[in-house]
Amino acid sequence: MRLGLMVGYSGAHVSLDMDLIREAERVGFDSVWTAEAWGSDAVSPLAWIGAQTGTIRLGTAIMQLPARSPASTAMTAMTLDALSGGRFLLGLGTSGPQVVEGWHGVAFDKPLTWLREYVTIVRAILAREGPLTFEGTRYQIPYRGPGATGLGKPLKSILHGRKEIPIYTGSMAPRSQALSAEIADGLLLTCMHPERFDVIEPHLREGFAKASRPKSLATFDVAPTVACVIGDDLDACRLPLKMSLALYIGGMGAKDKNFYGEYIRRVGFEADAMRIQSLYLDGKRDQAVAAVPDTLVDALHLVGPVARIRDRFAAWKSLPIGTLIVGTQQIEAVRLLAELAQS
């Protein structure tokens, strides 16, 4: 099992802990991952990180589809991959309707079709097997719709990039997890309950059965994110994770379409998820945080004293996952997990 480091996205001010990233690279972490929401983007920080590291791979978790055309994403991927010596990992996702329509100003329409077409076009650009043409529901290349000049012509990338840049898709929902298993090289999960791998495994196998090439859990990179907070005070360690879970379960999505909350329900915390969301949407943020049960935090994350984390890590190590992406701000956590992964 490989380890990745999640640095996510910045808040009000751009911030990257390069000491933490360099230490992760030194102790053997395979990859570092950025994200984007409606502030800092996922790509610019990776260019900065790539210029100051030498071996750690550089992943996006995720680049939002509505933020860029497929061609723009392919150009970015090829360029950053070339500049970093073949270290780029392309993670893509639709995001949710609140961000797609509220931030990017485009329709959240047929997201699975959108993702399939997007990945197909990106792969075609990377492959450079001929000038790009595509006829789909969302994309038509060259464009011939309303307002077209008729002057567009099929083009092939000038840049000869790496054809096999790995493509991941991010998803917490069953149908898009199946699609990921079918069309992508890996699946990015915001969180995962290690004892409930059965909740996602059938969808992965469904996708493998439809793939154009043989695929299995042995070759497909399931890459969940787990937070790690080391400390003797369990309540203090859990608190920032409860705040994050309350945000995702309660506020990352609309009341009737919240992919994170729906996953938490599926792994056995239905009543808790409903209460957290209700409190959060009512503006009772502190109460929503308090409603996150200790058992949920302990199931999804690595928290507490070193001995406790050592014991809990075994559950993750026993799973058929290729990469465990660690969210932490502690250098001691980076060192501990590197030791545990290699033992």
Regions found by a protein language model. Give the residues of each.
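Active-site-adjacent structural elements that line small-molecule/cofactor binding pockets in enzymes
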Residues: 1-343
